[in-house]
Design a protein with these regions (language model features):
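Catalytic cores of DNA base-excision repair glycosylases
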Residues: 2-144
Length: 144
């Protein structure tokens, strides 16, 4: 028997009421959490932390900062996370979409399923990354 959405949400609510928010995913802002979700693809979290620190040290940990960064500079800052050229392109794609979509405030108002579909339409955002973003950045009741 496959559980339905209503049953899963009921279980989620019982667990959430009993245990509260877990703050499992590190990050100082929802945007940083989303950047981490892109960068953690195929690498260890310690490497992601180094890449995020590089963005912070170069004052580029913002959607506009990432979009404005030269691709070769961005790739170099992301080098610790592996596949740095691919991740630089994916992160720029994501940030362009994020800005065009109106940023966190506008995206927060979008229905969960519609937001998931929009995230999946961004080149480089797959199902697990989209679900990470929904759960940890947008506080949506989804399973990863």
């Amino acid at each position: 028997m496959k559980p339905d959405r209503k049953s899963l949400l009921a279980v989620f609510n019982v667990l959430f009421t009993a245990h509260g928010p877990q703050y499992w995913w590190p990050g100082d802002s929802p945007f940083e959490i989303m950047v981490g979700a892109v960068l953690t693809q195929n690498t260890a979290w310690t490497n992601v932390e180094k890449a995020i620190a590089n963005l912070v040290n170069h004052d580029k940990l913002s959607p506009a900062g990432i979009v404005a960064a030269r691709k070769d500079h961005l790739a170099n800052w992301l080098r610790p996370s592996g596949y740095f050229n691919v991740k630089a392109a994916r992160l720029k794609n994501f940030c362009r979409w994020y800005i065009e979509a109106g940023g966190f405030t506008a995206l927060s108002k979008v229905d969960t399923q519609a937001l998931r579909e929009a995230l999946l339409a961004v080149n480089g955002i797959g199902p697990e990354t989209a679900d990470d973003m929904l759960l940890y950045a947008f506080d949506r009741p989804v399973f990863v």
